[in-house]
């Protein structure tokens, strides 16, 4: 048990709380401590009965059963893997900026969920984070099952198809990818490549709550230092030297 505790404490803070909630809320529903009916994002209950917790619980809840258990575990792995990589990579030392990214993506997903009657938001939020990581590491070569290798920029779409095969919904993954693209476009692509203004800015109260642990933040519309160094070394193309790809299931 001490090994599990040490591993859990080694997870970066924001990812650790997100991971724990995504385990705890389905467990509470599975044990019947609270009816899962209270966890879904039902527009009528949220908008007219003022059950304001539903957007939060719908983000963490997933109905785990014989037909959905593998899909749940795979996406829980994606949450741990890519949220950890972002929080300790592009957002290293900047927890407020990382939390703001999650909040921005979450708000967009909640609005979309209410408009499209999406009752569960766990997979879209995970996919949005995975998409941002894939774009920041777009030329890294990653390995997937059966020895397939491809650039990271294609990973969100490969996983979209993979989740569909194992019982997921294309809509959930697609919404997550689109929200991740919106964040990446507004924070990086539009200011950097198109010379536009910065539309996203982390609120100051988040910096007061979660101060940066080191100076020289990347800032919105400016690529992280690792991204800039890789671009300089590779002339803007080729395989980035930001770490090794991984095979799904590797530790």
UniProtKB/Swiss-Prot annotation:
Q: How does it sit in the membrane?
A: Multi-pass membrane protein
Residues annotated with Phosphoserine modification: 201, 226
Offer one Pfam family short name for this entry.
DER1
Q: What is this protein called?
A: Derlin-1
Looking up InterPro entries in the UniProt record yields:
DER1 (IPR007599), Rhomboid-like_sf (IPR035952)
The organism's place on the tree of life at top rank: Eukaryota
Query: Cytoplasmic side of the membrane: what ranges?
Result: 2-15, 90-94, 138-154, 190-251
Q: Where in the cell is it found?
A: Endoplasmic reticulum membrane
Q: How does it assemble?
A: Homotetramer. The four subunits of the tetramer are arranged in a twofold symmetry. Forms homo- and heterooligomers with DERL2 and DERL3; binding to DERL3 is poorer than that between DERL2 and DERL3. Interacts (via SHP-box motif) with VCP. Interacts with AMFR, SELENOS, SEL1L, SELENOK and SYVN1, as well as with SEL1L-SYVN1 and VCP-SELENOS protein complexes; this interaction is weaker than that observed between DERL2 and these complexes. Interacts with NGLY1 and YOD1. Does not bind to EDEM1. Interacts with DNAJB9. Interacts with RNF103. Interacts with HM13.
Please indicate if the UniProt record lists Transmembrane as a keyword: yes
Q: Where are the transmembrane segments?
A: 16-31, 70-89, 95-115, 123-137, 155-166, 171-189
Q: Which residues carry this modification: Phosphothreonine?
A: 202
Predominant subcellular localization, coarse grouping: endoplasmic reticulum
Q: Which residues carry this modification: N-acetylserine?
A: 2
Q: Which family does it belong to?
A: Belongs to the derlin family.
| Residue segments, region Disordered | 229-251
SUPFAM superfamilies in the record, alphabetically? Rhomboid-like (SSF144091)
Q: Which residues lie on this side of the membrane: Lumenal?
A: 32-69, 116-122, 167-170
The UniProt function text for this chain reads: Functional component of endoplasmic reticulum-associated degradation (ERAD) for misfolded lumenal proteins. Forms homotetramers which encircle a large channel traversing the endoplasmic reticulum (ER) membrane. This allows the retrotranslocation of misfolded proteins from the ER into the cytosol where they are ubiquitinated and degraded by the proteasome. The channel has a lateral gate within the membrane which provides direct access to membrane proteins with no need to reenter the ER lumen first. May mediate the interaction between VCP and the misfolded protein.
- Record flagged with keyword Hydrolase: no
Origin species: Bos taurus (Bovine)
Q: Cite the GO molecular-function annotations of the record.
A: ATPase binding; identical protein binding; MHC class I protein binding; signal recognition particle binding; ubiquitin protein ligase binding; ubiquitin-specific protease binding
GO CC terms of this entry: Derlin-1 retrotranslocation complex; Derlin-1-VIMP complex; early endosome; endoplasmic reticulum membrane; endoplasmic reticulum quality control compartment; late endosome
Which keywords does UniProt give here? Acetylation, Endoplasmic reticulum, Membrane, Phosphoprotein, Protein transport, Transmembrane, Transmembrane helix, Transport, Unfolded protein response
